[in-house]
Design a protein with these regions (language model features):
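Short, Lys/Arg-enriched N-terminal segments with co-localized hydrophobic residues
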Residues: 3-15
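Auxiliary tRNA-acceptor-end handling modules of aminoacyl-tRNA synthetases
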Residues: 13-21, 35, 44-47, 56-169
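Active/ligand-binding-proximal structured segments within catalytic/core domains
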Residues: 21-40, 50
Length: 169
């Protein structure tokens, strides 16, 4: 088995991995969302993709994040990474997915669910207590993410439209 080395400014060390960097970063975004959910249970989540230089997750919550909050989120992420939590994929039919997201108050995810074609599979990934509407892929467990460093906070309009609510990124 050949292992590849990946390096990013968002990672404090080289990571030996069988996964593409995009997959590692996307998984890191999920772990960040799980950490935010632990610290701020009222958070509503939109999307959390990998980017050319790292990853982000857009969310809406009462608490306005400041730079000092990044340390607490990062600390919670490191604990989740250390627990080597599995990324478990499961499918749901549309009605059950709508019910679950509605009961959880995840209004942005409900809108994203509506974008999925009627005949498409609806997949979720569970990492610890965090469950996310997501097509993947992900690493097998959070321990395969390696070290992370959160660098900044930004704002982003839902769906990139200034008429929509400003989310935190």
């Amino acid at each position: 088995m050949v292992k590849k080395f990946f390096y990013s400014l968002h990672y404090s060390e080289r990571i030996m991995s069988n996964y593409p960097l995009e997959t590692i970063r996307h998984s890191a975004a999920h772990v960040m969302a799980a950490a935010v959910q632990q610290l701020y249970p009222d958070a509503k989540f939109d999307i959390g993709p990998s980017t050319e230089n790292g990853f982000y997750y857009d969310f809406d919550m009462e608490h306005r994040l400041v730079t000092e909050d990044l340390k607490a989120i990062e600390k919670a992420m490191k604990k989740l990474i250390g627990r080597k939590l599995p990324f478990e994929c499961f499918e749901m039919n549309r009605a059950d997915a709508e019910k679950m997201l509605s009961e959880a108050g995840q209004t942005y995810k409900l809108e994203r669910l509506a974008d999925i074609p009627e005949d498409a599979k609806i997949t979720f990934y569970k990492t610890g207590d965090f469950v996310d509407l997501c097509r993947g892929p992900h690493v097998a467990n959070s321990g395969e993410i390696g070290a992370v460093k959160l660098l900044s906070i930004a704002g982003s309009y839902f769906r990139g439209d200034e008429k929509n609510k400003m989310l935190q990124r």
